[in-house]
Amino acid sequence: MRDALNTGLIEFLKASPTPFHATASLVQRLEAAGYKRLDERDSWDTETGGRYYVTRNDSSIIAIKLGKQSPLLNGIRMVGAHTDSPCLRVKPQPELQRQGFLQLGVEVYGGALLAPWFDRDLSLAGRVTYRRDGKVESQLIDFKLPVAIIPNLAIHLNRTANEGWAINPQNELPPILAQVAGDERIDFRALLTEQLAREHELIADVVLDYELSFYDTQDAALIGLNGDFIAGARLDNLLSCYAGLQALLAADSDETCVLVCNDHEEVGSCSACGADGPMLEQTLQRLLPDGDTYVRTVQRSLMVSADNAHGVHPNYADKHDGNHGPKLNAGPVIKVNNNQRYATNSETAGFFRHLCMAEEVPVQSFVVRSDMGCGSTIGPITASHLGVRTVDIGLPTFAMHSIRELCGSHDLAHLVKVLTAFYRSRELP
C-alpha cells in the first residue's frame, strides 16, 4: 500500500504543475471512480448514494459522496486542503528584452522561498483564454520542457552572497527564455498561440489573457539511502489533496463524505473559489436546502483541515518548541494555536487522536514557539464560515514553500489510513 501510494503521489505531482492542472487531475481520478460533474449553473438532481463533484474557476473542487445514512442524523465528514502553492506568476505584459535575452516579468505568488528558484530548469503552465471563431474559450497548457532559467550571479561578482542576500523580485527574478537578435521583438502571446496549436491542435484567433506559472521540471522522487523521503515541488499542499482523495475513494461507508480542495490559500483564501469565499457553504446549502436542516446537519458534522506541518529540522531544531518537534515518518501532526490560527480544540483533537490510536497510526502535536508568529490554514476560515467543528492536522515537511520540499515516505500511508477511518466513522463526537 505504501509504495503504491507514494508512486501515485509522484505521478499526481507531475501532472499538477498549477492549481488548474491539480483540479483537472482530481477530476480525472474522480470520474474514473464513477463521480459525476454537477454544474453550478444548473439545477441539481442528486440521489442517495450518488457520487458527485463541483469545480469553480477550474482551480477548486468539492467531491461529495452522498451516504445512505441521513446527514441530518449522522453529520457530514469533511476533509479540506488547498490546490495552490507559492510560485512565480507571469505578468500581463511580461516581455523584457535586455542584453540580447528574452525574459519574462514575474510576480511572486504567496510566501515563496525565492533563493531555490535560481539555477533550476523551469517550465511554464496554466490557463489561457483566447478567441476562436468569434467565441471566447479557455484551455490549460503545459510546455513541459525546460524553457527558462534564472541564473545566479557568480560569486566573483557578489562576494557577500553567502553572508545573506536580499533578493529583489522585480530585478532579479525574471527568467531567461532565449537569446534574440538586436532588433528582433518577441510577442509572448504569439508563443502561447503556437503552444495551443502544438498541445491541443487548435488555432486561436488571438490570445486574450492567461494565468501562467513557472515550475521546476525536476520530477518528485523517493530519496535517501533507505528511501525514507519524498522530495518534490508543491507537496504543500498537493500531498494533502492526494491523501484526501485516496481516503475518499477508499471509504466504502454509508456516511456522507466531502473533500474540498480550495485555491488561493497561500494568498489569504479571499476569492470566489477560496476558503474565505462561499463555495463550500453554497454547495452544502444546495444539498440541504432547508435552513433548519442545514444548520442542524453542520452542527453534527466535523472538518479535518489537512495542510502540511513544520517538521523539526536537525540543523535548526531551536526553531521549534522543545516539547513539540514533529518528526518525519512519525505520523500526522495535530496543530494547535490558542490564538485561533488553527481551528483545533480539545474535542476535535481528541477525536482525531482517538482515530489514530484505533488505526495504530502514530500521531504528533505541534505548537509554535511562544516567541514566534504562527501561520494559518483554511481550517479557521472554514470553521468561521460554516460554524463546523474543525481539527487542523498535517504531515511533517522540510523546506515548506521552497521550489522543492521534503516529506517522509511513510507518512502518506499514515494519513490516508486515518482519513479513511474518519470517512468511515459511524459516530462523530
UniProtKB/Swiss-Prot annotation:
Gene3D superfamilies: Aminopeptidase i, Domain 2, Zn peptidases. The keyword Zinc applies. GO terms for molecular function: aminopeptidase activity; metallopeptidase activity; zinc ion binding. Keywords: Aminopeptidase, Hydrolase, Metal-binding, Metalloprotease, Protease, Zinc. Its cofactor is Zn(2+). It is an enzyme of class 3 (hydrolase). The keyword Cell inner membrane does not apply. Its EC number is 3.4.11.-. Zn(2+) binds at residues 82, 156, 401. GO terms for cellular component: cytoplasm. Pfam families: Peptidase_M18. GO terms for biological process: proteolysis. HAMAP family: Aminopeptidase_M18_2. PANTHER family: ASPARTYL AMINOPEPTIDASE. Belongs to the peptidase M18 family. This is Probable M18 family aminopeptidase 2. It comes from Pseudomonas putida (strain ATCC 47054 / DSM 6125 / CFBP 8728 / NCIMB 11950 / KT2440). The gene is apeB.
